[in-house]
Amino acid sequence: MGPRCTLHPLSLLVQVTALAAALAQGRLPAFLPCELQPHGLVNCNWLFLKSVPHFSAAAPRANVTSLSLLSNRIHHLHDSDFVHLSSLRTLNLKWNCPPAGLSPMHFPCHMTIEPNTFLAVPTLEELNLSYNSITTVPALPDSLVSLSLSRTNILVLDPTHLTGLHALRYLYMDGNCYYKNPCQGALEVVPGALLGLGNLTHLSLKYNNLTEVPRSLPPSLETLLLSYNHIVTLTPEDLANLTALRVLDVGGNCRRCDHARNPCRECPKDHPKLHSDTFSHLSRLEGLVLKDSSLYNLDTRWFRGLDRLQVLDLSENFLYDCITKTTAFQGLARLRSLNLSFNYHKKVSFAHLHLAPSFGHLRSLKELDMHGIFFRSLSETTLQPLVQLPMLQTLRLQMNFINQAQLSIFGAFPGLLYVDLSDNRISGAARPVAITREVDGRERVWLPSRNLAPRPLDTLRSEDFMPNCKAFSFTLDLSRNNLVTIQSEMFARLSRLECLRLSHNSISQAVNGSQFVPLTSLRVLDLSHNKLDLYHGRSFTELPRLEALDLSYNSQPFTMQGVGHNLSFVAQLPALRYLSLAHNDIHSRVSQQLCSASLCALDFSGNDLSRMWAEGDLYLRFFQGLRSLVWLDLSQNHLHTLLPRALDNLPKSLKHLHLRDNNLAFFNWSSLTLLPKLETLDLAGNQLKALSNGSLPSGTQLRRLDLSGNSIGFVNPGFFALAKQLEELNLSANALKTVEPSWFGSMVGNLKVLDVSANPLHCACGATFVGFLLEVQAAVPGLPSRVKCGSPGQLQGHSIFAQDLRLCLDETLSWNCFGISLLAMALGLVVPMLHHLCGWDLWYCFHLCLAWLPHRGQRRGADALFYDAFVVFDKAQSAVADWVYNELRVQLEERRGRRALRLCLEERDWLPGKTLFENLWASVYSSRKTLFVLAHTDRVSGLLRASFLLAQQRLLEDRKDVVVLVILRPDAYRSRYVRLRQRLCRQSVLLWPHQPRGQGSFWAQLGTALTRDNHHFYNRNFCRGPTTAE
């Protein structure tokens, strides 16, 4: 074992004193290892804590109102854990000790909560104990307003559990008994268990295997959630006293299993059973959820008396026929939202859908969801009852396999704001339907030969780039359909349309300015993920009010060899402000310059600007004509360098420049003066290794600089000092080992954000960056938890405030350890070299010297051997094993009287806990002889072979032949080794006689062979046998 360096007690005392002084002065973050966030929240999430942190008395603990300990490993809560937090109102202990079924590795866990843990916090109002293995409700303070006990192991609720919680308003107990958190039965709510909670307004008991509504619920309830249990019968008595109820969710209790996304129990036949007066007395009900309930019809009497009903969810049922003829909606004049999604017929796609006339009585309806009903034609008659609804704003018809759609019908809806027809099969303007035959009164049509296009992954875009369509008055979503071409007649009567989404289609036509003629009010057009041919110079010029145009991911035409592309249409769009040409692999044969007086944001990421600028001056002024451009994204353009002349030809109005994920290994910082208005520069994800060439120029307006994800390991002193306007600096995920105040100078006081996380900081004793980060800790996000050490190895991955004081050694001790380690290294080099050059000579001399030592040659006495014989045989052969245990063992150990032998058997005498080789070696060397019982000698492997080799090794080392062979079958004599051994040492090879009269002689010969040295058995005509040197 190498030398060990010890710590001087005085050095440790000095370090402890320094740390205590720093904490007393308030320099360290107050709530280490957690982070103090605005509004009194202390965030301790995902820190792998095993106990509740006890914050220092110097910390402003009285100001803590919220404490979040989400996703740690706290298994025991003590009475004193929260006593010092006198103002605590919100406590989150979710995901600390999850039940085995919810644990990622299914490890069992049990959380222990001492009796006064929460009683010691009289101000506590909100407590979250979800996803913890607790079996009973702990003692709680009477100030509690919200309590979450979801996904726990609490299976019984009785009146004693919640006694005194008169202020409780919200109680959540979801998922305590379901397929992910299984139990033997169901959650038991004792009648009247919740009756004492006079202020309870919200109760959630979802996923608990309940078979009936709990009895004697408090009449103050306004929200009752009982979905995904097994309540298949509802009567007026179940909800008798809940007259204040405003929201009732009983969906998923009698499920439609052909559409289930998780384990599902089939609904019993002739169920569910809903009494006609079940909801009639709930006059204040505003929201009713009956989704996934296997409903085939709607009883008009169910909605009798529900004059205030505003939200009705009937999705995932079997109401495909009911939708066309029901009268149940006639009395729901205040209904605002109706969900009928996935009420499809199994394996049937309807040719047409005609809504029942009762839809026309929903005068207050604002949102109608009918996706997943599966009908193939959308015509004027389909939605006829909805035309007269004055407040209808949102209509969802996606995922219906619609292949023929008359889009002009939406022009008759004056108040419509959003129509979603995405994920259908619309391929163009509606054509006459070809009727083939009628089956069961249901019209069938030919389905298109093409399949529904697979939905590709959505591409995330910056929120501050393309406008959100929710801000416009009318939006039509036709994304993820089968459109190949666009004809203007598709959009007849849609002049009011302001936002049109056509992404993820297969549009491959050349747009020439005639496709969108009717859309005179269109302001946003999304054509991403298509195959548009931008050849004509008048593309989109029929849209005079177009403000945002997304042409990203239309790369196929740009990758075709020899095909030109005309981008001059940009100059002819007077209102265009946002344009995306991202991820089109644009590299050649395009317009030499983009021109626009109105464009303020351009996304040109995911192209090949490096090849364009490599063509001399051909594309050098590509962006110069965009006189009003403020935001430019040139990320992922394979740029290896950015010359000053390239920056000089960017618009001078530019304020935000993004150059993420290029290959930039060098940046000329002085060239930033060429962009006088630049405020944001994003260079993340490049290959910068140092900030050593100059510094940020003085007078720059730069406010945000992102250098994350590079390999920066060195920064020049004063590099950021002249950038007086810099407020946000991101240096995360680089190779920085320190953060020096000399980099910033006097401008450090202007920084609002300084991100240095994910750097391999070197946490040496007295590191200056710790003190500097403490001075600017208000600007460093995640300082206690995200800023971590990269070295030394003992601290790698730990917080910079978790420094081990034992690593801080004084100088003398450090030099001593260095000298000892240097000596050890030298010996480590010299010894193997000497062993390689003259190892045999050294070995010979060493053993020659040992031979002269007294008692070296003394042989080990027979009394040192623990066994007379180690019996080796093939356990896989049951006959051999039976002979050893019932014949050999009995004869040698039990029937020889005082001459009984001590045998070593593997299954009886080997020690558990040792390795196989350790037991084998001990058995061979602790036995006088090694007895091999063989039924055959041609295939010897495994334990037999290893034992034989050890016996041979003992022959070489101790010059003792310890092998004795017992042959159970005569044909085993065919082995050459057996024949040779029988000739040299006949008494050590014995054959088991199958005649009873010869067995007595066999046992006598075997006893002699095991008790005498084999040296006496060798045939002197051939050899003398092995001898032991004295």
Curated annotation (Swiss-Prot):
SMART domains: LRR_BAC, LRR_SD22, LRR_TYP, TIR. InterPro entries: Leu-rich_rpt, Leu-rich_rpt_typical-subtyp, LRR_12, LRR_dom_sf, TIR_dom, Toll_tir_struct_dom_sf. It is a single-pass type I membrane protein. Activated by proteolytic cleavage of the flexible loop between repeats LRR14 and LRR15 within the ectodomain. Cleavage requires UNC93B1. Proteolytically processed by first removing the majority of the ectodomain by either asparagine endopeptidase (AEP) or a cathepsin followed by a trimming event that is solely cathepsin mediated and required for optimal receptor signaling. It is found in: Endoplasmic reticulum membrane; Endosome; Lysosome; Cytoplasmic vesicle, Phagosome. One of its GO terms (molecular function) is unmethylated CpG binding. Residues 1-24 form the signal peptide. Disulfide bonds join 34-44, 97-109, 177-183, 254-267, 257-264, 469-499, 763-789, 765-808. Residues 838-1030 are cytoplasmic. LRR repeats lie at residues 61-84, 86-109, 121-146, 149-165, 166-189, 197-220, 222-241, 242-267, 282-305, 307-331, 332-355, 362-385, 389-412, 414-439, 469-493, 495-518, 519-542, 544-571, 573-597, 599-621, 626-649, 651-674, 675-698, 700-722, 723-746, 748-771. Residues 25-816 are extracellular. The chain crosses the membrane at residues 817-837. DNA binds at residues 46-50, 71-76, 94-108, 131, 151, 178-180, 207, 261. Keywords: Cytoplasmic vesicle, Disulfide bond, Endoplasmic reticulum, Endosome, Glycoprotein, Immunity, Inflammatory response, Innate immunity, Leucine-rich repeat, Lipoprotein, Lysosome, Membrane, Palmitate, Receptor, Repeat, Signal, Transmembrane, Transmembrane helix. Glycans are attached at residues 63, 128, 199, 209, 241, 339, 512, 566, 668, 693, 730. A lipid is attached at residues 257, 264 (S-palmitoyl cysteine). It comes from the Eukaryota. One of its GO terms (cellular component) is endoplasmic reticulum membrane. Residues 865-1010 form the TIR domain. PANTHER family: TOLL-LIKE RECEPTOR 7-RELATED, TOLL-LIKE RECEPTOR 9. Key component of innate and adaptive immunity. TLRs (Toll-like receptors) control host immune response against pathogens through recognition of molecular patterns specific to microorganisms. TLR9 is a nucleotide-sensing TLR which is activated by unmethylated cytidine-phosphate-guanosine (CpG) dinucleotides. Acts via MYD88 and TRAF6, leading to NF-kappa-B activation, cytokine secretion and the inflammatory response. Upon CpG stimulation, induces B-cell proliferation, activation, survival and antibody production. Monomer and homodimer. Exists as a monomer in the absence of unmethylated cytidine-phosphate-guanosine (CpG) ligand. Proteolytic processing of an insertion loop (Z-loop) is required for homodimerization upon binding to the unmethylated CpG ligand leading to its activation. Interacts with MYD88 via their respective TIR domains. Interacts with BTK. Interacts (via transmembrane domain) with UNC93B1. Interacts with CD300LH; the interaction may promote full activation of TLR9-triggered innate responses. This is Toll-like receptor 9. It comes from Sus scrofa.
